[in-house]
Amino acid sequence: MITKSEALDFLKFNSINPILEKLEDINTRNSSKTITFSKNAFIPVCNWCRNVCGYCTFRAEDFKLLKMEEMKEILIKADVFGCREALFTFGENVDENEKVKEELKKMGYSGILEYLYEISAWCLENTNLLPHTNCGILSYDELKYLREVNASMGLMLENSSERLCSTIAHEKSPGKDPNLRIEMIENAGKLKIPFTTGILIGIGETLEERIDSIFEIKRIHEKYGNIQEVIVQNFRSKPKIPMENYKEPSPVEMFKMIILSKLILEDISIQVPPNLNRETGQLFLMAGIDDWGGVSPLTKDFVNPEAPWPDIEELNSFSKELGFNLKERLPVYEKYIAEEWLDKKILEKIKK
C-alpha cells in the first residue's frame, strides 16, 4: 500500500528509476494484458449548464435541447452500428434556465429528469443500448429515480480541493464544490449504482491536491464498493476559453499520475480518453490504464469536439503493438452485473 507521502515523493522525484520500479510492479499485476472500451453513442440532451467552468466549451447560453425524436433517431442509428452504451449528458441543473423549463413544459414534461427518464426507458425497450447518465449534481432521490433506467452513472470528482472553487477554473461553478460531488458519489454508493468518476489534471491544482483526490476516491470505494472506473483526464487548451493560455500537463505528469492512480486504486479500472491523448495514449498502456472509455463510431465528443475519436481498428492496432488485447465491454462492468447493483429490467436485458 502506497502512502500519501510516498506518492508525493514519487511525483516530485525526477529520476527514471522510481518510474521503472513502479512500472514493473504494475505490469506484474496486469497479467491479462487486456484493455477494454465501450462502443457508445453520445447524446447531448441539452448544452446549457449553471456552471461556467474556465476550461469548458460544452456550455452555451444559446442552448439546444434535443427533441425526443432526434434522440430516438440517434439511438436507432447507434443500434445499427452495434453500439451498446447510450451516454446521456446535459449541463447541471438545466431546469434553472427558464427557457429550458418552458421548452420542456411545452412538450409535456415537468422537468429534465422526467424527459431523461422517458428517453432512457424507450432506449431500454427498443434498442440494444444501455443508458449511462452524466449530468452533474443529483440528489439522493434523483439518483434513486434514474437508477431504474441506468446501467451505470457518472460524475467527475475533478479535484477534492475547495481552494479551486476560488480560481479561474471553478469560481463561477457552484456545482464544482467538491463536498457536493463527494456527497453524490457516496449517495450513488448507498444506492448501489455502478459509478464512473475521475480527476482532471492541469486546472491549477497542486501535486498534493492530485494525490488527495485519488485517496478520496479510494476512501469512498472502500466504504461502498461502487466505483467501477476512474478517469485520469488531462486539461486541453481550447480557443476562446478563460483558460486558453494555461499550460497543459506534460506526458510525464500524466504518466506518473496514471501510475499512482493504478497503484493506489488497485482493482478499480483506470481510463484515459484516447481522443485527448492520440500521441501519448499508447504509452499510457504501460503506466497502468486498462480502459479506453467510450468510443463512438457515430457521434462526436461534444465536450471535446475538436478531438475526434480514434476508430476502433486504430485502437486495436496500437493496443496490440504493446501486446494488449482490446475487448469491448458494456457501460456497466462485468463484476457489477448482479441483482445487488442493477434494476431487475436492466439485469434481464443484459442476460438475454
Curated annotation (Swiss-Prot):
EC category: lyase
Membrane spanning residue stretches: none
Annotated catalysed reactions: 5-amino-5-(4-hydroxybenzyl)-6-(D-ribitylimino)-5,6-dihydrouracil + S-adenosyl-L-methionine = 7,8-didemethyl-8-hydroxy-5-deazariboflavin + 5'-deoxyadenosine + L-methionine + NH4(+) + H(+)
Record text on cofactor binding: Binds 1 [4Fe-4S] cluster. The cluster is coordinated with 3 cysteines and an exchangeable S-adenosyl-L-methionine.
Binding sites annotated in the UniProt record for [4Fe-4S] cluster: 49, 53, 56
Listed EC numbers: 4.3.1.32
Record GO terms (molecular function): 4 iron, 4 sulfur cluster binding; 7,8-didemethyl-8-hydroxy-5-deazariboflavin synthase activity; iron ion binding; transferase activity, transferring alkyl or aryl (other than methyl) groups
Cofactor(s) listed: [4Fe-4S] cluster
InterPro entries in the record: Aldolase_TIM (IPR013785), CofG_family (IPR019939), Elp3/MiaA/NifB-like_rSAM (IPR006638), F420 (IPR034405), rSAM (IPR007197)
Pathway: Cofactor biosynthesis; coenzyme F0 biosynthesis
Keywords (A to Z) from UniProt: 4Fe-4S, Iron, Iron-sulfur, Lyase, Metal-binding, S-adenosyl-L-methionine
Statement: the UniProt record of this protein carries the keyword Protein transport: no
Segments forming domain Radical SAM core: 35-275
Pfam family, one: Radical_SAM
Keyword S-adenosyl-L-methionine set for record: yes
Role noted for this protein: Catalyzes the radical-mediated synthesis of 7,8-didemethyl-8-hydroxy-5-deazariboflavin from 5-amino-5-(4-hydroxybenzyl)-6-(D-ribitylimino)-5,6-dihydrouracil.
Family: Belongs to the radical SAM superfamily. CofG family.
Cross-referenced NCBIfam families: F420_cofG, PRK06245.1
Subunit structure: Consists of two subunits, CofG and CofH.
Protein name per UniProt: 7,8-didemethyl-8-hydroxy-5-deazariboflavin synthase
The organism of origin for this protein: Methanococcus maripaludis (strain C6 / ATCC BAA-1332)
Taxonomic classification: Archaea, Methanobacteriati, Methanobacteriota, Methanomada group, Methanococci
